[in-house]
Amino acid sequence: VPPSEKVINAEPYNCSLGAPWKKANVTTKMYKNEKKLLYPVNVGRNIARESAITHYILASDIELYPSPDLPARFLEMIRRRDQPALTKPNPKVFVLPIFEVDEKSLPPRNKTALIRMLKTGSAIPFHKKLCSGCHNVPKSKEWLEAAETEGMHVFHVGKRTGPFVHWEPIFIGTNTDPMYDERLSWEGKSDKMTQGYALCVLDYDFLILDNAFLVHRPGIKVFKKDPRREVLTAKTNILIKKIIVPELKVMYGTRKGCAV
């Protein structure tokens, strides 16, 4: 990737033309795509985590919008520390359920609005049409039936086992949690699965928050056949099975019910 100084100094730019990224064709004109590079999503996640100056970290994706006032409400819950789940000795992370909204809708500002959108069909659970099991949250039906309340609380403590053995949650954690494997790319998929296995073996509790959630940038995701990505996915699956999983077993051991 060329240094930013080289790009800036390459030629004069007429600022009256507006921002160049507004006219960019992100499908074909991105440097990554022109050079057939893979998107190193886990490198980005780890850099973001290690660069954070706070104790708690939300290693989320840039297109996932947190519900408003999440930091203040979360930290107040931590300050109160008045729920049994918060005082258990197990290592823990705080899970945010994820949703999609249609391209004509604005992200909901609270859980009440989210539930209303789910009932009308303008919102759906994340990846429902792509990989519903990957983001199916324990007690999700009960979560949706529970009315919004004041503040923030732990709704349920889940585990990455049983029906949720392939769960890929996004959560608030700390830098004591296992890092993401940087050999995995966005194009190859399964980029959070190996970390999920480590969390399971280490007996992490997944504390699902009641009035907090993430919403993907508007637009419902639908399946699109991508032959190049299918090839990369197959290679990634082999890498995980033959190389990464044996390494994880040496590093963290095994636990009944845990799988990548």
Protein language model annotation of sequence segments:
Residues 60:
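Catalytic metal- and UDP-sugar-binding loop of GT-A-like glycosyltransferases, i.e.
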Residues 195, 199:
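Short active-site alpha-helical segment characteristic of glycosyltransferases
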Residues 1-30:
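Acidic donor-binding segment of Leloir-type glycosyltransferases
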Residues 22-37, 45, 49-50, 64-188, ...:
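Conserved catalytic core of nucleotide-sugar-dependent glycosyltransferases
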Residues 57:
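Short aromatic/hydrophobic "clamp" motif used to bind/position activated sugar donors
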Residues 200-214:
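Catalytic donor-sugar/metal-binding loop of nucleotide-sugar-dependent glycosyltransferases
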